Amino acid sequence: MTTEASNPEVNATAEVAVPVNPLLRSVTVEIPSDVVDAERNKHVQQYAKLARVPGFRKGKVPPSVIRTRFAQDINEEIVRTLIPHYFREETGKQNLQPVSQPQVTDLHLHDGEPLKFTAEFEILPEIPTTGYENIKVEHPPVEVTDAEIEDTIKSLQEQRATYDPIEDRAAEDGDFVQISFEGRDKSDPEAKPVEVPSIMVELGGSNTVQEFTENLRGTKAGDEKTFDVVYPADYGDQRLAGKSVEYHVSVKSLKKKIFPELDEAFISELGADVKTPDELRAKIREGAEHEKKHHAEHEGKDKLVDALVKLNDFPVPESMVNSQIEIRLERGLRALAQQGMRTEDMKKMDFGKLREGQREAATREVKASLLLEKIADAEKIEVSDEELDRQIAGLARQSQQSPEQVRARLTQDGSLDRIRTQIRNEKTLDLLYSRSA
């Protein structure tokens, strides 16, 4: 329901509400009693048509009964209808642009009287854009070495390596030994031993404890070994740090790691649309150069934003910072869930401390966004429908929905403008980065 409110005279004032927050404003509004009465009568009539009241037929309940029985509900409807309308009208008259939801205080609503309320809200600050044209950041040359390419090829071969059994000799460094073992904590005889029925260790490997390499070197299938491992206090696995463990190990088999040859058969398995080793190296170089360029550009833009924020200091609306904190917190919790953290464990976290820990980064992000929006205005940067469509198509692929479904959802929850602003800011940052060399 809407109410036309351009004719009645409205009394309003605007003032700074709290000196501590220079962006906090308040408006005090008085809506004439005849407007309030008309709105009340409208809701009384609507309730009278639908309300079911004992002793009365539906649609035949007297207005006086409706006013008494549904007084609170009707008042809530009046507030919900009139306050947003008159709030927008008054802030418009005062040339104020709220960026936060108004907090209504001092509400006065009684039959036959004007509706009076005070609403506090934040506005955007004056945003300076000093010196953005002159910011310079390093654009390092992108170089991919032959050694990096060979390391990538070796990694691809490693992923497709096979293991051949060794039956004609004892284990030596570089071999893989299939073992089972039992480990006992020597400082706690009552502790239950740790039993591992099958595991493969690489003799001399970077992830293999030295004592395992020394004691398994020279063994064959069927051999058994007993030895101690003393773990340092700073050992990575806290369950073992500082402990002395006795291991009883049974050797099951020995294996040699076989890497595939860099031939057409191996290359075809990669599905990289290349056929020869030289073509593969060229493909790897292209991908590595793209990745390095992207990484360097990301770092450069980050430094550019830091410089931009440092050059232009201004107060930031707390409401916008708090919203950004929630976005960062939600993103972090989603990442923890993907890593396997249980909901019960998340609930035990100190969210107050987490939110405060995000405040500095959130403030920087809000400042950067406001600065980029202001610069976009100055540079007349716009977002085309095609650019928005591409972004929506990308979101659709990620969420496995159709672009139409994603657009409808974004429109419904009010996120479409946010997406457009995000694209515009990215274009602005691209422009600044291109000028910063």
From Swiss-Prot:
Disulfide bonds: none annotated. InterPro entries: PPIase_dom_sf, PPIase_FKBP_dom, Trig_fac, Trigger_fac_C, Trigger_fac_C_sf, Trigger_fac_ribosome-bd_bac, Trigger_fac_ribosome-bd_sf, Trigger_fact/SurA_dom_sf. It catalyses: [protein]-peptidylproline (omega=180) = [protein]-peptidylproline (omega=0). Its EC number is 5.2.1.8. Residues 174-260 form the PPIase FKBP-type domain. One of its GO terms (cellular component) is cytoplasm. It is found in: Cytoplasm. The keyword Acetylation does not apply. Signal peptide: none annotated. The keyword Cell cycle applies. Keywords: Cell cycle, Cell division, Chaperone, Cytoplasm, Isomerase, Rotamase. GO terms for molecular function: peptidyl-prolyl cis-trans isomerase activity; protein folding chaperone; ribosome binding. SUPFAM superfamilies: FKBP-like (SSF54534), Triger factor/SurA peptide-binding domain-like (SSF109998), Trigger factor ribosome-binding domain (SSF102735). Its main location: cytoplasm. It comes from the Bacteria. GO terms for biological process: 'de novo' cotranslational protein folding; cell division; chaperone-mediated protein folding; protein transport; protein unfolding. NCBIfam families: tig. Involved in protein export. Acts as a chaperone by maintaining the newly synthesized protein in an open conformation. Functions as a peptidyl-prolyl cis-trans isomerase. Consists of 3 domains; the N-terminus binds the ribosome, the middle domain has PPIase activity, while the C-terminus has intrinsic chaperone activity on its own. Belongs to the FKBP-type PPIase family. Tig subfamily. This is Trigger factor.
